[in-house]
């Protein structure tokens, strides 16, 4: 199959692509590829090309209100340290581990392990 399409991304053929596209000589697939690859200005009509400066995009009101409300990064304390992190709200209760329960479970396991070791030594 012969390739009749010109390469739209190589810099040395841009003038040829612009000439062919301005005369409507590009195939629909080639022009679609140019649009997707960012070379759409090569496919558009010469009078449709605007080389002026882009207008600055106004930040959204939501982003501005977040800055006003103190969202984003938390301000630092006067001594340079960041504020301590607050725990996130969770609808599920966080189980509190009772130290006595933990101590008794660990003690039982230690006694059981000691019994196994003593049994192996005695054999």
UniProtKB/Swiss-Prot annotation:
The cross-references to InterPro entries, in alphabetical order and at most eight, read:
DUF4687 (IPR031487)
PANTHER family named among the record's database cross-references? GENE 5617-RELATED, SIMILAR TO HYPOTHETICAL PROTEIN FLJ20010
Query: Which residue ranges have biased composition labelled Basic and acidic residues?
Result: 61-82
Mind giving the lineage of the organism this protein is from? Eukaryota, Metazoa, Chordata, Craniata, Vertebrata
Specify the domain of life of the species encoding this protein.
Answer: Eukaryota
In which residue ranges is the amino acid composition biased (Polar residues)? 1-12
> Could you tell me which residues belong to the region Disordered?
1-25, 53-91
Native species: Homo sapiens
**Protein name per the record:** Uncharacterized protein C11orf71
Q: Which gene encodes it?
A: C11orf71
């Amino acid at each position: 199959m012969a390739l009749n399409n010109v390469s739209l991304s190589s810099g040395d053929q841009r003038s040829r692509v612009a000439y062919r596209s301005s005369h409507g000589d590009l195939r629909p697939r080639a022009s679609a590829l140019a649009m997707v690859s960012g070379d759409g200005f090569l496919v558009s009509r010469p009078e449709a090309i605007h080389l002026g400066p882009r207008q600055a995009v106004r930040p959204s009101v939501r982003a501005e209100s977040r800055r006003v409300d103190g969202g984003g990064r938390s301000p630092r304390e006067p001594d340079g340290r960041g504020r301590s992190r607050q725990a996130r709200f969770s609808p599920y209760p966080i189980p509190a581990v009772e130290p006595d329960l933990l101590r008794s479970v660990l003690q039982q396991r230690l006694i059981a392990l000691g019994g196994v070791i003593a049994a192996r030594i005695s054999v």
